[in-house]
Curated annotation (Swiss-Prot):
<protein>
    <recommendedName>
        <fullName>Elongation factor Ts</fullName>
    </recommendedName>
</protein>
<dbReference type="InterPro" id="IPR014039">
    <property type="entry name" value="Transl_elong_EFTs/EF1B_dimer"/>
</dbReference>
<dbReference type="InterPro" id="IPR009060">
    <property type="entry name" value="UBA-like_sf"/>
</dbReference>
<comment type="similarity">
    <text>Belongs to the EF-Ts family.</text>
</comment>
<dbReference type="GO" id="GO:0003746">
    <property type="term" value="F:translation elongation factor activity"/>
</dbReference>
<keyword id="KW-0648">Protein biosynthesis</keyword>
<keyword id="KW-0251">Elongation factor</keyword>
<comment type="function">
    <text>Associates with the EF-Tu.GDP complex and induces the exchange of GDP to GTP. It remains bound to the aminoacyl-tRNA.EF-Tu.GTP complex up to the GTP hydrolysis stage on the ribosome.</text>
</comment>
<dbReference type="Pfam" id="PF00889">
    <property type="entry name" value="EF_TS"/>
</dbReference>
<dbReference type="InterPro" id="IPR036402">
    <property type="entry name" value="EF-Ts_dimer_sf"/>
</dbReference>
<dbReference type="GO" id="GO:0005737">
    <property type="term" value="C:cytoplasm"/>
</dbReference>
<keyword id="KW-0963">Cytoplasm</keyword>
<dbReference type="InterPro" id="IPR001816">
    <property type="entry name" value="Transl_elong_EFTs/EF1B"/>
</dbReference>
<feature type="region of interest" description="Involved in Mg(2+) ion dislocation from EF-Tu">
    <location>
        <begin position="87"/>
        <end position="90"/>
    </location>
</feature>
<dbReference type="InterPro" id="IPR018101">
    <property type="entry name" value="Transl_elong_Ts_CS"/>
</dbReference>
Length: 290
């Protein structure tokens, strides 16, 4: 059957499939465009299944925010998603990035809290056209209270789109979040988190089992020292506290003022603003790192 070039082009524009594939699909479907579109989709889904086991080490992290009325109120909700693929070439493709942004917007608008079929279908649509294994690996949605509730969301995505941060702050004095210096500090905390990628917010958040294991490691380090037991224990405790300071957000030296920890800098900013600041939630995504 002879297939008109305009029909092939029309099908290609709709599906993104190659010209020869579109022509073959139209021939298989006796020129029926809807049938050909379905044919291509089914073939694409089959190809996706064949590629499912391929490694997806590339991708992007994207954030979308909804802002409350009035610029001073900050974001009322923030969505962050991680979309992965096989190659750096696709990860940098405008269409792939646009897909991640649409997914983040959908999470924001529909308050999705987990990956669902609607979102998977959005990924499949592009994956069938670019012939690469893709996956929406995780998403998160954080909400702030009303403008006067004493809550504030700040966020940051690194330019390479491989690290994203959303931080939630609270205060008993809601007006502190109207101050530019407090908001700047909140944003700087996001920059800090992206640079240092702390594993925990507070020392109390570190699992007891992990602390025990690290203590045993440090005890092994000092076992051969010719020192009294209480001195060895003091050395172990010092090493443990230093290690916890390295992996806990509040204990790390603040990125913009390394003479103070994040915790002490936050206390300083809060005191100057007239209201104590607190972290209520910290969400850090690194591409491929769960």
């Amino acid at each position: 059957m002879e297939i008109a070039a305009r029909d092939v082009k029309s099908l290609r524009d709709k599906t993104g499939a190659g010209m020869m594939e579109c022509k073959r699909a139209l021939q298989e479907c006796a020129g029926d465009a809807l049938c050909a579109e379905k044919y291509l989709k089914e073939r694409g889904l089959a190809a996706i299944e064949n590629r499912r086991g391929r490694a997806t080490a590339e991708g992007v992290i994207v954030i979308k925010a909804r802002h409350a009325e009035g610029a001073a109120c900050g974001a009322s909700a923030v969505a962050m998603v991680e979309l992965v693929c096989e190659t750096d070439f696709v990860a940098k493709n405008a269409e792939f990035i646009a897909l991640a942004e649409r997914i983040a917007q959908a999470v924001l608008e529909h308050a999705y809290t987990e990956v669902n079929q609607v979102l998977r279908d959005m990924v499949v649509d592009l994956a069938t056209r670019v012939r690469e294994n893709m996956s929406l690996t995780r998403l998160a949605l954080l909400r702030a209270g009303s403008a006067g509730a004493g809550q504030y969301l700040s966020h940051y995505v690194h330019p390479d789109k491989k690290t994203g941060v959303v931080l939630s702050f609270s205060s008993d004095a809601p007006d502190v979040f109207l101050r530019s210096d407090v908001r700047a500090f909140a944003y700087d905390c996001c920059l800090h988190a992206a640079a240092y990628t702390p594993r925990y917010v507070r020392a109390e958040d570190v699992p007891a089992e992990y602390v025990r294991e690290q203590r045993e490691v440090f005890q092994a380090h000092v076992a051969s020292l010719q020192k009294p037991a209480h001195v060895k224990e003091s050395i172990v405790q010092g090493k443990l506290e230093k290690h916890l300071a390295e992996i806990c957000f509040l204990k790390q030296p603040f990125v913009k003022d390394d003479k103070l920890s994040v915790e002490k800098k936050m206390a300083e900013v809060g005191a100057r603003a007239g209201g104590a600041l607190r972290f209520t939630q910290a969400l850090i995504y690194q591409l491929g790192v769960q």
